[in-house]
Amino acid sequence: MFTLITHLGIRLLVARPSGLCPPEGAVVPNQRRVTRRLGLKVLLAAAVTLPLSSAAITASSASSAAPRARRTATLAAPATPAPRLDVMTFNLRYADTAEPNSWADRRPVMRELLHRARPQVIGTQEGLYQQLLDIDTDLGPHYDWIGTGREGGSRDESTAVYYDVRRLAPVEHYTFWLSDTPEVIRSNTWGAAFPRIVTWVRFRDLADDGREFYVANTHFDQRSQYARERSATLLAKRIAEFDPTLPVVVTGDFNAYAHKNPAYDTLLGSGLVDTWDAAEHRGPQYATFHGYRRLKPDGDRIDWILTSPGVTTHRATMDTFSMHGQFPSDHLPVQVSLSLR
């Protein structure tokens, strides 16, 4: 459900946290200008991020109109290095009450892991609505998130993207379904066990002169190889429709082994780069799905972070943090440090 809010003369279309879902077959609303999630943060974002866009345009125009008489034969200032961006992909394991490994037991461990890691972007998978609110609370006031349930609205699992509001401002975002009818809510036409989605966000980097980039976050099906391959093809097609001048970061649980699955080959064949392979420095590798069992060194990776060419990966790690033998999830989060230019 969406509500039209007017604040400071700005009209915003905002998702209502009713949990209600549109009727089956409904077409997904155009979310491209919905830049934040619910409540007061939406209004604050409108007051902060929209003027940034106008200011950037004004500053650019003012610069080009500078009097020619001011030009002097001075040396050009050296280019400043791009600030590094820390990105994590993390399958949260959906919240449940079953023991062992209930959400109540895992939540404090996840809170501590995220507080230690502090990435600026976290692409998550499997999060349920209340679980996402818990993580939002635990991350604190400097983080926000964007996401839609795969059943529409706040229903069922999400591919929510968390981000540090001190560093990043969302410009636009969108969620589509991995099916033959991507704009139809809950659509599932490739034999997947569940509807599958991609949430992408176009961010402005406040620490890098307002430069923009995309993050696309997804969770491929665990049952159908056909669905995984079709999902990879559609994801590559949608990424190709992004502004080609902007960097792209892709996060996700792909339920496919890197280097061993056609879905992986499709995405890398489209020009994307596997940050784990490209990293200048790498931590130890494990199977990223461990199922709360002993970690498997040199195991297969189903959780990846990919980028467009030209992005530098300085370091890639898998976070093995646990407390008293309790892991925060049945997956290991993967984190990379990037320079987008």
Label each residue range with its predicted role.
Residues 83-86, 155-158, 195-199, 211-216, ...:
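Residues that flank catalytic or metal-binding motifs in active/ligand-binding sites
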Residues 89-107, 178-192, 221:
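Acidic/histidine-rich helix-loop elements
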